[in-house]
Each structure stands twice: as structure tokens, then as C-alpha cells.
């Protein structure tokens, strides 16, 4: 039985690291088909989710009350999952340079709780090269595991438009990628199970990262023209 089949059968779990306006809708979408561990460092936010309150207002209280996501602020629960999705923020420093502290912190937490054979997929908006040159080395160092041997990686940029109740995560085409061709196909297969709008498998992680940068740039240019 493949890992994909094990995820669908409930034998293996998926984790979502970062339950904000990006992570929460993804967690809820996957929880309809796969057992999901939803992790966030903010214990107060976790308690709100457990009580049926959606502080992000992205999916609504009714959906939160019904979802089967296993909400937790305990990082050791990540050991239960084999497929991890990182959806933490990527803010900007005062000098307008990217602040990679959140993604590096998430990488460190995953490294401390990574089991052999796991796949780590980043969704956070980053410039080309961050996944493989910044995040993966942290996971590798902390876990003591070898990249593309003991664990694998992918990148699938978040494309959610916050507050848009019509174009939800399932209805926005997803770009996917993997650290090897085989892992890329697997990551694409996992996302295809919930993204009804379809997916596009990029040839490499860096290409997927660049696609997000280009999309954001195009959006800024279009807004500038309208203004």
C-alpha cells in the first residue's frame, strides 16, 4: 500500500503547521478525506478552534465545529503524521527584506518531530531557493536525517484570497512540486484529492517558488494600473 493510499485509509496522517487564514482552510479541506493533525504554537487560538470558534473568519464557526481536525499546540503530536504542510506567515523586516524566522522556526519544530519517510511541503510565500537552501538544511540538522533519503520535500504556494468566500482553497488551481520527480507526482496526487479546480505539477521546487513570486508581482502591477 502506497503512502497516498495509507493517508486515504487513515493508516497515516497529515499535519498542518500554522493554522491562520492560509492553514485553516487547507486543514479543513483535507480533514474531509484524511486524518489531520492541526498544529499551532498559539495555545489560545487552539482553544478557540476546539470550542468551535474560527478566529480567522475564513471557514466559519459552523465548519470549525464539524471538522475532524485534531487541533493541538503540542509539537510532539506531529510525530503521528507522515505528510506535513507548513503554512506559517512570511512577514517583512523593517528594511523590507523577507523575515524567514517563522518558516525556519517551523522547520526546526518539524525536525524535532520528524519520522523516517516523511514528506514536508511548504506553502509559505518565499523567494526561489528558500525551501531547499534555508528550510531543508534546518530540518536536516535538527532531525539528523538525510534529505531525499530519510525524508523528502515539496513546495505548493498558497494562493488563497483572504475573505473571498467564493474562491475558496478547493476552487483555486494549485501549483505543486517535489524534491524528486516521484515525490512531485505524489505531492500532486495528494493535493488533487481535495483541489477540485485542478493542479499543475511544476518541474522543480524553485520553479514553483518562482511562480508564486511572479503571480504576486503581476497582481501588484494590475492593481497599480487600475489605480
Regions found by a protein language model. Give the residues of each.
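Structural/interface elements that position substrates and couple domains in central-metabolism enzymes
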Residues: 1-227
Amino acid at each position: 500500500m502506497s503512502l497516498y493510499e495509507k493517508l486515504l485509509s487513515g493508516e497515516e496522517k497529515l499535519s498542518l503547521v500554522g493554522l491562520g487564514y492560509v492553514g485553516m482552510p487547507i486543514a479543513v479541506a483535507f480533514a474531509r478525506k484524511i486524518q489531520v493533525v492541526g498544529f499551532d504554537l498559539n495555545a489560545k487560538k487552539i482553544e478557540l478552534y476546539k470550542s468551535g470558534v474560527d478566529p480567522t473568519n475564513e471557514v466559519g464557526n459552523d465548519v470549525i465545529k464539524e471538522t475532524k481536525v485534531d487541533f493541538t499546540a503540542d509539537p510532539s503530536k506531529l510525530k503521528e503524521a507522515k505528510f506535513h504542510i507548513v503554512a506559517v506567515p512570511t512577514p517583512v523586516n523593517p528594511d523590507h527584506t523577507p523575515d524567514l524566522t517563522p518558516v525556519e522556526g517551523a522547520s526546526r519544530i518539524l525536525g524535532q518531530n520528524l519520522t523516517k519517510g516523511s514528506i514536508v511541503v511548504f506553502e509559505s510565500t518565499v523567494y526561489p531557493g528558500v525551501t531547499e537552501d534555508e528550510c531543508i538544511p534546518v530540518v536536516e540538522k535538527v532531525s539528523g536525517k538525510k534529505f531525499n533519503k530519510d525524508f523528502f520535500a515539496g513546495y505548493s504556494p498558497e494562493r488563497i484570497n483572504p475573505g473571498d468566500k467564493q474562491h475558496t482553497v478547493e476552487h483555486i488551481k494549485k501549483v505543486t512540486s517535489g524534491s524528486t520527480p516521484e515525490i512531485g507526482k505524489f505531492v500532486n496526487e495528494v493535493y488533487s484529492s481535495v483541489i477540485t479546480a485542478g493542479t499543475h505539477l511544476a518541474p522543480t521546487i524553485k520553479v514553483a517558488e518562482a511562480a508564486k513570486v511572479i503571480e504576486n508581482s503581476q497582481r501588484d502591477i494590475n492593481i497599480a494600473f487600475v489605480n
